[in-house]
Amino acid sequence: MKFTKSEALHKEALEHIVGGVNSPSRSFKAVGGGAPVAMERGKGAYFWDVDGNKYIDYLAAYGPIITGHAHPHITKAITTAAENGVLYGTPTALEVKFAKMLKEAMPALDKVRFVNSGTEAVMTTIRVARAYTGRTKIMKFAGCYHGHSDLVLVAAGSGPSTLGTPDSAGVPQSIAQEVITVPFNNIETLKEALDKWGHEVAAILVEPIVGNFGIVEPKPGFLEKVNELVHEAGALVIYDEVITAFRFMYGGAQDLLGVTPDLTALGKVIGGGLPIGAYGGKKEIMEQVAPLGPAYQAGTMAGNPASMASGIACLEVLQQEGLYEKLDELGAMLEKGILEQAAKHNIDITLNRLKGALTVYFTTNTIEDYDAAQDTDGEMFGKFFKLMLQEGVNLAPSKYEAWFLTTEHTKEDIEYTIEAVGRAFAALADNK
């Protein structure tokens, strides 16, 4: 494939947009550099770039596009909303209908509030938890991404008995001191941190199924023990289901795993491709939010008719019988094929999969936490990524990200992808 127009467009973008991209994850810095491919249109499971190259898409916009690109039911809903006016600044029937749909899907949501992104949703759940508990410190798990607000851009200190350090320039040390970061899937370290800091902790942020250093499931009993220990400390449990809600099961990870949080942050899939976020939880906690309570949150675009219409339409599609079973079936087929190709070409990989999402790590180690995910071959992944791009298979340009299937992928798409993986692995083996 040739990428002449993408390269020219990136050169122009560098003159006008910081780094040439509007999110750093879109750059190719983590896969050896070069101009990122600029897409022109998408339909179903496919992309076409500005040079006319066609791809099978496993990026799915980092998760939201579960129904494929330009799904007709969602497109019709967005078009109708646009014709009626996309922003009112008033209550609408659409936001009430959508809130009811979310509550029916996720019983832990007694009350809901819409915002404009997953970052906003997480940021506000933290504020609400602090208001409810009267405490200030937050706990999170290492490597789990909860958006780009200051409180969650914090890395672990030197151990569970130390406070965090800023993970980005511009995050003050004073804010990092309010965050305790511990390893995922490690109850003993969590207990040690709670023994020291629990009386100051307002809440713990949890990705119930990790999606930001690859797909990593909790060990059996881990989430139940997190709930027990955190509640014993008088703190709240916040589930960040921005990636997981409606991705693995209609009712989210909390329904799939049978564990209930106090507050939940939502985003990505629930917007049907448009900007959205939402948060909700127990009635007595959510009533801390203005205008009922003292925790302030507002938004000009929050609950806008276009996003509400798109979200409603997306959930209507996902209610169709058999879609999640299809995603699981195709995911299993893809997993089997990739592992067979790795064995055939003597390529060392570990593959983590849950239903229609998976991550290929270039390592032989088991991946259960962030340290293990970091200790994988990023250079090898970068080469693999570029080879797959030439094969017409679009992946996320990072060794940490997942492959996301959509309801529009077919068995033929999976078969082609497995063949492409085989050719890529053969090329990697030849250049070892």
Swiss-Prot record:
Functional pathway: Porphyrin-containing compound metabolism; protoporphyrin-IX biosynthesis; 5-aminolevulinate from L-glutamyl-tRNA(Glu): step 2/2
Signal sequence extent: none
PROSITE patterns associated with the record: AA_TRANSFER_CLASS_3
Key word tRNA processing present: no
Source species, domain of life: Bacteria
UniProtKB keywords: Cytoplasm, Isomerase, Porphyrin biosynthesis, Pyridoxal phosphate
The keyword Nucleotide-binding appears for this protein: no
Gene Ontology, cellular component aspect: cytoplasm
Needed co-factor(s): pyridoxal 5'-phosphate
Residues modified as N6-(pyridoxal phosphate)lysine: K268
Its EC number(s): 5.4.3.8
Catalytic activity field: (S)-4-amino-5-oxopentanoate = 5-aminolevulinate
CDD domains: OAT_like (cd00610)
GO biological process: protoporphyrinogen IX biosynthetic process
Quaternary state and interactors: Homodimer.
Name by which UniProt lists this protein: Glutamate-1-semialdehyde 2,1-aminomutase 1
The species this protein was found in: Bacillus cereus (strain ZK / E33L)
